[in-house]
Design a protein with these regions (language model features):
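Hydrophobic faces of well-ordered beta-strands that scaffold small-molecule active sites
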Residues: 23-31, 48-50, 78-80, 95-97, ...
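Active-site beta-loop-alpha junctions enriched in small/polar residues
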Residues: 30-34, 53, 83, 100, ...
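Glycine-rich phosphate-binding active-site loops on the catalytic face of alpha/beta enzymes
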Residues: 51-53, 99-107, 139-152, 184-217
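Alpha-helix-loop-beta-strand connector modules within alpha/beta enzyme cores
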Residues: 61-82, 99, 107-123, 153-175, ...
Length: 222
């Protein structure tokens, strides 16, 4: 059983990336536009990720520049998904990468630029692989089925999350995938420290109320 595996303690292949402001990142908004990014930051969210697809290079350049500016304006930790070169160019707070990006991204350049690095993990092996890179935070997913990505065979569930959290005590930890208001508190009760949401904000009838309710649910779990 993968959950019964002992964690090796001798990973020393990489120095640490710059740390986040806190071990508990709280409500983490993942958005696909700078309009939504600003709406979230206006409501007091302090950790967010810009995840955009299917844009031209010029559009990406402008979006990421704007996202970085918003992060500074609202004193928030804004991570750029995937586009690490543009994140470095515009002085982003951090970059979020998937496991598939680890072999192609210039991690040394990201670290030398002082950017934080968040890594996605889907299961025990990927968690250990991420640990090897000493990222600024680690994301565990998908906790529940989600419509934003095809996570067939990669649903972790609360049972695995509860096992993973204490193994990675030295990192800020983020749970992601299919989490809505009805699930946020029980996810936060695992001790994960941060709950990432996508549709729970952007598809809510009232995003202001949704953000407030999510923040209350996450805080009440601690």
């Amino acid at each position: 059983d993968e959950l019964d595996f002992d964690v090796p303690l001798d990973f020393n292949m990489a120095a640490d990336f710059a740390p986040c402001e806190s071990k508990s990142l709280g409500l983490y908004a993942v958005v696909d536009s700078t309009d939504w990014l600003e709406k979230c930051l206006q409501q007091g969210i302090k950790t967010a990720q810009l995840r955009v697809k299917n844009k031209t290079q010029d559009e990406l350049d402008e979006l990421i520049k704007h996202a970085v500016e918003l992060g500074k304006q609202y004193n928030a930790q804004v991570f750029i998904n995937d586009y690490w070169q543009l994140a470095i160019k515009h002085g982003a707070y951090g970059v979020h990468l998937g496991q598939e990006d680890l072999d192609i991204a210039n991690l040394a350049a990201i670290k030398d630029a002082g950017l934080r690095l968040g890594l996605s993990t889907h299961g025990f092996y990927e968690m250990l692989r991420a640990h090897n890179y000493r990222p600024s935070y680690m994301a565990f997913g998908a906790i529940y089925p989600t419509t934003t990505k095809d996570m067939t065979g990669q649903i972790q569930g609360l049972e695995k999350l509860i096992k993973f959290v204490p193994l990675m005590q030295s990192y800020p930890k983020v749970a992601i995938g299919g989490i809505d208001l009805s699930r946020a508190e029980q996810v936060a009760k695992t001790g994960v420290g941060s709950v990432a949401v996508v549709r729970a904000i952007t598809e809510a009838d009232n995003y202001v109320e949704a953000i407030s309710a999510l923040q209350v649910a996450i805080r009440s779990a601690h």
